[in-house]
């Protein structure tokens, strides 16, 4: 018998709130594939909260401390989209949606269906989907896909971690951050990855002209600067590409460069 996904699994939410009342918009951060809400915790959540932005990050179903790990393989982008919408509805006022990589694709799907207060796509999956990325990496770095296909947090070896590091981080990432990131790696839904391969995040272009910011990293070998520019062109905006950062730009030593660029966009919404 086909097992249906639970309608509302428990979802982990991490938050940092300003110390005093603020009129600045709340922010809802959406993590990328294989990750969870922790990836925003070391730097972005406290940094934005200190500047008056109520900052929230959720773990999608089957990730982090959220429920649904037993049915993760059945979860598609539509299920992740529902998770984001459910948490957004619990926040006092409409949040700005900020997605990283796969999380950016989820934000794009939401933008295609309704106006949002504002949105930021960080290192987004390009309009062409995952297949060109996978093809490029299979040619240039064939070991990458082998390692990613077998990501199992319970059996994450030092060798696998070392093999994946150059794809996600720059050479100077703090060892403590790298070790903690490895602890928060999750298995990813094969259905969600299939959805990204079919470009299901792209099928409905934005029609409501919500304020949008697209940010990429010069050192990103997963979602390259050209990939990021393709996403920006699709939405008829200009991409911002920052030097000195890699794919996990929110955890890099120079993470503040990305945070300040994002803050500049947020200032236009006030």
List PLM regions with ranges.
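Conserved alpha/beta-hydrolase
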Residues: 47-69
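Catalytic active-site module of serine/aspartate enzymes centered on a nucleophile-bearing elbow/loop
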Residues: 238-270
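Active-site loop/oxyanion-hole signature of alpha/beta-hydrolase fold enzymes
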Residues: 65-95
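The serine-hydrolase catalytic nucleophile loop
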Residues: 33-45
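Conserved alpha/beta-hydrolase "acid-adjacent" motif
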Residues: 221-230
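Active-site glycine-rich loops that stabilize anionic/oxyanionic intermediates
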Residues: 31-36, 101, 218
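Flexible "cap/lid" loop of the alpha/beta hydrolase fold
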Residues: 115-150, 192-196
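Short beta-strand/loop motif that positions the catalytic acidic residue
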Residues: 208, 214-216
């Amino acid at each position: 018998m086909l097992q249906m996904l639970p309608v509302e699994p428990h979802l982990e939410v991490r938050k940092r709130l300003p110390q005093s009342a603020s009129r600045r918009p709340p922010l809802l951060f959406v993590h990328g594939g294989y990750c969870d809400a922790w990836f925003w915790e070391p730097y972005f959540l406290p940094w934005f909260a200190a500047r008056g932005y109520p900052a929230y990050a959720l773990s999608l179903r089957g990730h982090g401390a959220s429920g649904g790990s037993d049915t993760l393989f059945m979860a598609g982008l539509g299920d992740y989209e529902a998770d984001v919408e459910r948490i957004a509805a619990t926040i006092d006022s409409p949040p700005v949606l900020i997605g990283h990589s796969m999380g950016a694709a989820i934000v794009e799907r939401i933008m295609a269906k309704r106006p949002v207060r504002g949105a930021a796509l960080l290192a987004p999956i390009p309009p062409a989907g995952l297949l060109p990325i996978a093809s490029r990496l299979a040619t240039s770095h064939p070991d990458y896909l082998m390692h990613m296909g077998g990501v199992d947090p319970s059996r994450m070896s030092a060798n696998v971690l070392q093999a994946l590091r150059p794809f996600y981080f720059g050479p100077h990432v703090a060892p403590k951050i790298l070790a903690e990131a490895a602890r928060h790696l999750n298995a990813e839904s094969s259905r969600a990855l299939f959805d990204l391969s079919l470009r299901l995040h792209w099928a409905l272009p934005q029609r409501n002209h919500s304020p949008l910011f697209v940010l990429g990293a010069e050192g990103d070998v997963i979602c390259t600067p050209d990939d990021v520019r393709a996403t920006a062109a699709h939405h008829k905006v200009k991409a911002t590409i920052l030097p000195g950062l890699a794919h996990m730009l929110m955890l890099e030593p120079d993470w503040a460069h990305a945070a300040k660029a994002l803050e500049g966009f947020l200032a236009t919404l006030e």
